[in-house]
Amino acid sequence: MDDNDEKVEFLVDKYIPNSISDIYQPEYEYYNKLDKKSIKSLDWKDSSPDKCYFHKNILNRLKLISEDNSLPHIIFYGNPGSGKKTLINLFLEMIYDKSIYKLDDSKYTVISSGNMENEIIVKQSDYHIIIEPNNNNFDRYLIQDIVKEYAKRYPLCIYENSRNFKIVQINNLDNLSYYAQTSLRRTIEKYSKTCRFVMWCYSLSKVIEPLRSRCLCIHVPNQTEDDLIKWAFNISSLEKINLPINILNNIITNSNGNLKKILWKLDLYKFTNRVNNGYEKSLVKLLDSIRDNNIELIREYIYKMMITNIEAKVIIKDLLNIILTKY
């Protein structure tokens, strides 16, 4: 790439907030008058969650919770792309500061069954740690040993924004097995004096009741189609994407409320003048093959999708969405 070439910046990096100061979106009339970079210059201290575009009530609630040292354990749950991880990042910034985005790789030793030692790399900042479950029996050892070591690794209350607890963030809570969740419940009880647990999942039905009862459960809903259309239209206007209204409606309908998916599709249309990627085209062809009872083509399309690391349950779910949308 030449020095004169501009680096491509994707919409998902520009419009998914990276910090508190990013969450405020002006009204459309004012929107076009702003320079693109000035949108991210608004300060949290001079604003309030009422001015944000999505999830105003949740952010107001989190603002109040963050001001109290008796913070509860929290589970965020909602559909993919509804904004759970973004809300968690903003919440952690409310509690501490922007240094929560400075993540380093840390090594932890986890002893599994048979006294086997496993070295695990996890992301952590000065204030919190992020645990990614593996969806297997190893998860219960992972949570027990990492939290135990993390709780005693750094002395507390030595940073500028001192709190008497650290945060343990657990992603994909509903991927944990029953025994891993019971182990997590015991771990939460044991280390609740020095750690708070902030977790997210897609469905609370896969989380055991003893775990739910020990946490504040916050539902992160999908946005209405009207709000999504206005949001996407504002972005397309700001980015000077000539987007017909029927294409915009198609993007919103097929994105199932997933904010990141909407931004990726806007980017796709901006650079290629189309909104469907190769995977979505393959799904339509697969559906046609099913209707024609063509077993060989069905196997071929499924195989091609699965070797690109797309899970079978995802393929089935996306097929069902197409059927419900088009038929």
Where are these regions (language model features)?
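Active-site catalytic pocket residues across diverse enzymes, especially alpha/beta-hydrolases
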Residues: 95, 99, 188, 270
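Alpha-helical scaffolding segments of alpha/beta enzyme cores, especially the outer helices
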Residues: 182-186, 264
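Conserved AAA+ ATPase "SRH/arginine-finger" region at the nucleotide-binding site
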Residues: 132-135, 216-228
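A short helix-turn-beta junction within AAA+ P-loop NTPase domains corresponding to the substrate/partner-engaging
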Residues: 186, 193-195, 209-223
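P-loop/Walker A NTP-binding region and its immediately flanking N-terminal helices
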Residues: 1-183, 193-199, 209-210
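Conserved H-loop
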Residues: 202-203
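Eukaryote-skewed repeat-based solenoidal scaffolds used as protein-protein interaction platforms
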Residues: 163, 185-187, 225-234, 245, ...
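AAA+ P-loop NTPase domains with strong preference for DNA replication initiators
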Residues: 1-4, 35-38, 68-70, 233-327
